[in-house]
Amino acid sequence: MAPQKPETFMLSTEAQQALPHDAQVALQQVDNLKYFLISAPVDWQPDQYIRRFLLPTGEYVSCVLWNNLFHISGTDIVRCLSFRFQAFGRPVKNSKKFEEGIFSDLRNLKSGTDASLEEPKSAFLDFLYKNNCIRTQKKQKVFYWYSVPHDRLFLDALERDLKREKMGQEATTVAVSEPALSFQYDSSQSLYEQLTKTQQANSSSFSAQQPAFPPGQSSSPVMRNMDAMPRPI
């Protein structure tokens, strides 16, 4: 059973299968990005410091090795999310306000545990700037690669806009195509909570369908949710 995706978990199986070809291609491109976000730090050459992924938008997202740790910039996180909203059928129309919301969420990721706080024009920021990973060399956090809950950030940004629309306010993104047009918002609980429950239900169903294995044998494949983590405090 395929894991539920943040972009389509609110749709029925029939609705997911009936998505237009363009929407299916776009969601496959999101899967390609997610694979990069999982696998980028693997199998580097001894003298390698950066690995890039070309988004369909024409922008690059970079995994950067610095001080023996893998990093991603806030700018690249926003690029990932902007692309995901576009692929979802809800492109960004107010970039400034959209970015402000993402960077506000990123404040939950703390220096030292989730990110490196870099002083203005540090050697690291200079490297990132020269490689188009950041737009400015002002003091900022650069995030540890696996500390960033990408799905959670997507859902929280989507929920903010859906709430704005429900209250008659201007959203930072606008639904123009599927699956966004068919996405039904239930405001009784957060989107992330709804996704987590759906994933847990599917995981339980998956486990119940698996044959029993003798001790010492593994029931592969093991299902793992990349962003199944509590909100950082």
Please state what every model-predicted region is.
Residues 1-75, 169-233:
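Proline/serine/threonine-rich intrinsically disordered activation/regulatory regions
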Residues 23-27, 88, 107, 124:
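Homeobox/homeodomain signature
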Residues 27, 34, 47-52, 58-61, ...:
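Beta-strand-rich binding-surface signature
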Residues 28, 35, 39, 79, ...:
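Charged/polar, solvent-exposed surface patches and flexible loops
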Residues 95-182:
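Chromatin/DNA-recognition segments of nuclear transcriptional regulators
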